[in-house]
């Protein structure tokens, strides 16, 4: 609502309801959740932990039930807030000529939701309400469910189409609403990369029926340590059970909580909406095998069509941006000194999980640091007998290669001390993203990296109270390492007024 808007003036407004944000559902201390969320509900609206339906990938414990009920309470408040906005449209006489979109940005902020490539992380609610005067722009009748595949990249194009504006040439999305809708795609492409201090690389391809997932760091758990997420009680409970009493977790639950993950996964989303059964771990039917091959080929084609740079290590991208004095966007379009060989980069990445260690050993000698980087990860995913070949790469000209080699070697063997020394040295790198990669490697080493304790203490103290992404993530990772070794750190607090985030506008 704005007093500056003329009565007949068209408007476009976005309301972000934070009631179901990860901070509310799981991260805030429970007493803060009660004060900020639950206190706004009636007694009848508050959910009984004993009665909430748990997803099958969660262990059924009182801790998990309490927090899942908390999530439902957050959803209830969000629902009420949405109703209030719709009522305001009616009160202002705008409901009969306003198209309303309702959607989330990703799956729930609970474990195995947000940040994951499963449907629990990538599939979200999308409802669109057309008033009678605009129902000719809808793809189906009021109250119906439309099963078309839609991606967020389609939203700008669709809104522009609804108001009669042609999409710009550079826009990738299709228009799924309006008089001249674009055809439905066969697939939706999904990405998973570094989040805060947590390094990861995964991709997905979703058709109406199947979900294909490609994991490029299979040596890492789905449930990697993450300071912000680990403040939640459900995460703590799952991690504790996996470490102390794994027999209390079934196979489905250990798929998330276990120490590793498959390089590839394929799910029948119609028969298995929770993505519990990886079809590649059983015998595929003729139809499933054909679908799997089609999805894998389509994924390999789609990543090039979209110019996905995810196979390029972060430090290499930054080096190009600096050397060529332009954006990564222009570099990918070939508007600078060179056009990245994305096909080469992804081909090297595809060696991970394929057991083709002879090709990986050849790429280890490549002049291209991207190929050397992926060769190390490919060997780490099963080629353990080749680990000693990496000692010389601790002095590689590429920071990405040096650190990846050191990360693996530091877990044991003849090169362990030299590898840890390399990681400690990289903590002083001028680029925070390089220092962070080394810091994360040391964090996950835990007790094996006790020799890095003085350097990690120094790094933590230098960054804990500084502003900016780099210091924030470095303090996350270094602090988690110190906590694991029993050192004293300043607890993280993301509750309102704690100062970690700026307050929300009134």
Q: What spans do the regions from the language model cover?
A:
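Active-site-proximal cap/lid insertion segments
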Residues: 3-156, 160-170, 219-222, 226-264, ...
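Extended catalytic-interface subdomain
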Residues: 15, 151-155, 160, 192-197, ...
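Secretory-pathway/luminal and periplasmic proteins that interact with or process carbohydrate-rich
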Residues: 22, 107-112, 182-186, 465-468
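Short glycine-biased active-site loop of nucleotidyltransferases that positions the nucleotide triphosphate
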Residues: 115-119, 178-181, 203-204
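Long, internal low-complexity/basic segments
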Residues: 123, 248-264, 269-274, 281-422, ...
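Small-molecule pocket liners
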Residues: 124-126, 185-187, 203, 210, ...
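Acidic/polar loop patches that form or flank catalytic/metal-binding clefts of enzymes
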Residues: 136, 144-147, 164-174, 184-190, ...
């Amino acid at each position: 609502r704005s007093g500056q808007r003329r009565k007949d003036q068209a408007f476009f407004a976005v309301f972000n309801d934070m009631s179901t944000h990860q901070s509310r559902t799981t991260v805030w201390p429970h007493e803060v959740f009660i004060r900020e969320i639950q206190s706004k509900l009636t007694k009848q609206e508050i959910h009984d932990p004993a009665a909430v339906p748990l997803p099958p990938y969660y262990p059924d414990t009182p801790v998990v039930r309490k927090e899942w009920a908390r999530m439902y309470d957050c959803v209830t408040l969000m629902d009420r807030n949405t109703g209030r906005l719709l009522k305001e449209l009616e009160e202002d006489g705008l409901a009969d000529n306003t198209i309303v979109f309702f959607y989330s940005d990703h799956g729930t902020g609970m474990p195995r939701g947000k940040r994951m490539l499963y449907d629990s992380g990538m599939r979200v609610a999308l409802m669109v309400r057309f008033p009678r005067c605009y129902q000719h722009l809808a793809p189906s009748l009021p109250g119906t469910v439309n099963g078309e595949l839609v991606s967020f990249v389609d939203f700008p194009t669709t809104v522009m189409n609804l108001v009669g504006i042609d999409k710009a040439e550079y826009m990738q999305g299709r228009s799924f609403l309006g008089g001249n809708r674009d055809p439905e795609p066969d697939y939706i492409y999904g990405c998973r990369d570094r989040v805060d201090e947590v390094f990861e690389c995964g991709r997905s391809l979703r058709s109406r029926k199947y979900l294909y997932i490609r994991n490029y760091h299979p040596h890492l758990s789905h449930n990697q340590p993450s300071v912000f997420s680990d403040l939640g009680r459900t995460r703590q409970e799952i991690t504790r059970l996996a470490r102390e009493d794994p027999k209390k977790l079934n196979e489905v639950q250990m798929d998330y909580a276990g120490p590793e993950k498959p390089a590839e996964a394929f799910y029948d989303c119609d028969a298995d909406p929770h993505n519990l059964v990886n079809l590649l771990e059983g015998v595929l039917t003729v139809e499933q095998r054909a679908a799997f091959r089609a999805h894998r080929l389509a994924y390999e084609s789609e990543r090039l069509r979209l110019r996905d740079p995810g196979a390029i290590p972060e430090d290499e991208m930054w080096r190009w941006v600096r050397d060529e004095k332009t954006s990564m966007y222009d570099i990918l379009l070939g508007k600078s000194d060179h056009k990245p060989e994305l096909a080469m980069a992804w081909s090297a990445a595809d060696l991970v999980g394929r057991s083709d260690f002879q090709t990986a050993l050849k790429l280890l000698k490549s002049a291209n640091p991207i190929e050397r980087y992926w060769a190390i990860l490919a060997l780490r995913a099963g080629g353990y007998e080749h680990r000693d070949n990496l000692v010389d790469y601790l002095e590689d000209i590429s920071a990405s290669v040096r650190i990846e080699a050191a990360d693996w070697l530091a877990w044991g063997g003849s090169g362990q001390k030299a590898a840890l020394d390399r990681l400690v040295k990289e903590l002083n790198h001028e680029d925070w993203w390089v220092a962070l990669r080394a810091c994360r490697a040391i964090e996950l080493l835990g007790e094996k990296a006790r020799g890095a304790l003085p350097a990690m203490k120094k790094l933590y103290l230098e960054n804990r109270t500084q502003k900016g992404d780099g210091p924030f993530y470095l303090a996350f990772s270094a602090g988690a390492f110190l906590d694991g070794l029993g050192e004293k750190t300043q607890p993280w607090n993301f509750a309102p007024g704690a100062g970690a985030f700026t307050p929300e506008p009134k």
